[in-house]
Amino acid sequence: MIKVYGMPSCPDCAEVAKKIKAIGRESEFEIINIGEHVAYLKAFLQLRDREEAFRPVREGGYVGIPCFVREDGTVTLDPAEFGL
């Protein structure tokens, strides 16, 4: 299952969640709302701090959501890689 870190208040995250539902692929994705619980936020921040995919995000002062973590642990910020 692909993990999607995001927040409903983020327009890009909301659009990704909407597309996942619209194309009936909910069983392929676990959407994790980082604003729902501090444990989710901590997990995302640890990922954001260590993954190379976030370097431009960190340098630009951005949050980096939505973020996708594949089953093999690789990270991308590009929803198009999943047809979204």
Where are these regions (language model features)?
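Non-catalytic, surface beta->alpha helical segment in thiol-disulfide oxidoreductase systems
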Residues: V63-L84
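Thiol-based oxidoreductase modules, predominantly thioredoxin-like and allied folds used
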Residues: S27-R50
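Local sequence-structure signature of Cys/Sec-based thiol-disulfide redox active-site neighborhoods
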Residues: M1-N33
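Short C-terminal domain-edge/linker segments immediately following a structured domain
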Residues: I34-E36, G60-G64
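Short, internal strand/loop/helix patches
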Residues: R50-G61
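Amphipathic alpha-helical interface surfaces
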Residues: V16-K19, Y40-A43, D78
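Surface-exposed, flexible loop/turn segments at secondary-structure boundaries
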Residues: C10, H37, T76
